[in-house]
Amino acid sequence: MIEPLSKIPGGMRYYSGAEARLRRGVEDRIMAVFDGWSYDEITTPCVDYLALFERGMGYEEAHRAFRFTDSDGLMLALRPDVTSSVARAAATLFAERPRPLRFCYASPVFHQRQRTHAEWRRENKHLGGELIGVAGRAAEIETLSVAIEILTALSLRRDCRITVNSVEIFSGISEHLSLDALQRERMRQLVDTRDAAELQKFLSDFATTETERVSFARLMRLSGKGEILDGARRIITNPRSLAALDELESLWRIVEALDMADCCDIDLGDVSGLDYYTGLTFKIYVAGAGTRVGGGGRYDNLTGNFGRPEPAVGFVLDLDALTDLLMRRGSSTSDAGSGTDACTLLNSEATEPATLFMDARRRRAGNERVLINYRG
């Protein structure tokens, strides 16, 4: 049956009037913050090879894209993700550019999703930032600092919750239990959906003792501030997960020193579904949004798909989720205006991360443009 042309395809939207103005204002405000941290805007192709997204997002996520074949018989997809394309650009187009690279974007992404609720969408606009070519805590703190400044600029800091975790904790446990890829994914789904009963049942086939089975199930439900890390260490014995806990504790100490712990939590059950994350992950929630409004993490292996492996960390915000929330609150966001080319260079090598980012945030509060120099 052919749908009448007076309708639009399911999951698509028109925007006009106050809603369109709000969307433009929110986007401008977010991009102004990225500019203030010296991120360069990049636009990636709307149509790309399906294989690009299979490598970046994983097969299952990539195959939720709108797929089609071009005249040469090549399988293409409407872009379901931006990070994979930015990583390729870093490894190819910008291979000779001095590191680190900082990119930001405001781009629509498309997914074939099942209808689940009234606000179901198959097109979303993603606004994100990528910091490529820097390992270590300072780069991760920069990413979190930018995200929190954006939420503050949108008057959402008081109502936001950012959960941090490391995929290496989960990976170490999976390795300890000798899970294959399918079993690992099944356990990830059970952890992500907080299905405690099914998780314990699943673990009964792999845990060596009843105590281990119950302990691992409890571990995956641990969330809170830094004190939960001690509880996790009483359960975990494998070196890979213990090393990840040490790294998470190091990050958390800086989060506390920067007074960001009020809007951050550690959540060992917040397990990402994207294949490209390699260490830190975080998800962004705002009270009243009904779903997470963003997330990100470290993806050190992704650029290696294109011949240049290097560390990278980034995050994305969902413009639709943010503006839906702000519309319900009756918010209006005026244009943020353009940034300035003047820039204050801050040297990461000479300063502890907490002190470095205290200085950076103080300058950003005065609307200065800052650039963290990781090269010394």
Task: Give, region by region, the residue ranges found by the protein language model.
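Positively charged, Gly/Ser-enriched RNA/tRNA-binding surfaces
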Residues: 2, 19-37, 49, 83-96, ...
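A structural signal for short, well-ordered beta-strand segments and their strand-loop junctions
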Residues: 41-44, 105, 161-165, 265-267
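Acidic, His- and aromatic-enriched active-site or binding-groove loops in soluble protein domains
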Residues: 64-71, 178-201
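Extended alpha-helical scaffolds
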Residues: 154-157, 161, 167-171, 183, ...
